[in-house]
């Protein structure tokens, strides 16, 4: 359970950074 929790937290953090990066790219390249 602990290992899965850490893995999930890490994946969630990476996903959040990725989404934030996409949002920033879209904002910068928007009209």
From Swiss-Prot:
GO cellular component, one term: dendrite
Highest taxon, organism lineage: Eukaryota
Cellular compartments annotated: Perikaryon; Cell projection, Dendrite; Cell projection, Axon; Secreted
Tissue-wise expression: Detected throughout the central nervous system in fifth instar larvae, particularly in the medial and lateral neurosecretory cells and the dorsal unpaired median neurons of the mesothoracic ganglionic mass. Also detected in nerve processes over the salivary glands, dorsal hindgut, anterior dorsal vessel and dorsal diaphragm, and at the neurohemal sites of the abdominal nerves. Not detected in the nerves directly innervating the heart, alary muscles or posterior dorsal vessel.
One of the record's GO molecular function terms: G protein-coupled receptor binding
GO biological process: body fluid secretion; positive regulation of urine volume; regulation of heart contraction; regulation of hindgut contraction
Predominant subcellular localization, coarse grouping: other
InterPro entries from the UniProt entry: DH2-like
Key words, A-Z: Amidation, Cell projection, Hormone, Secreted
Coiled-coil features, chain-numbered ranges: none
Proline amide found at: 31
Family: Belongs to the diuretic hormone class 2 family.
Function statement: Regulation of fluid secretion. Stimulates primary urine secretion by the Malpighian tubules. Increases the frequency of contraction in the heart and hindgut. Causes a dose-dependent stimulation of cAMP levels in the dorsal vessel and hindgut, but not in Malpighian tubules. Has synergistic effects on urine secretion by Malpighian tubules with serotonin.
Name of the protein in its database record: Diuretic hormone class 2
């Amino acid at each position: 359970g602990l290992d899965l929790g850490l893995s999930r937290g890490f994946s969630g953090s990476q996903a959040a950074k990725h989404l934030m990066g996409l949002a920033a790219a879209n904002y910068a390249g928007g009209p």
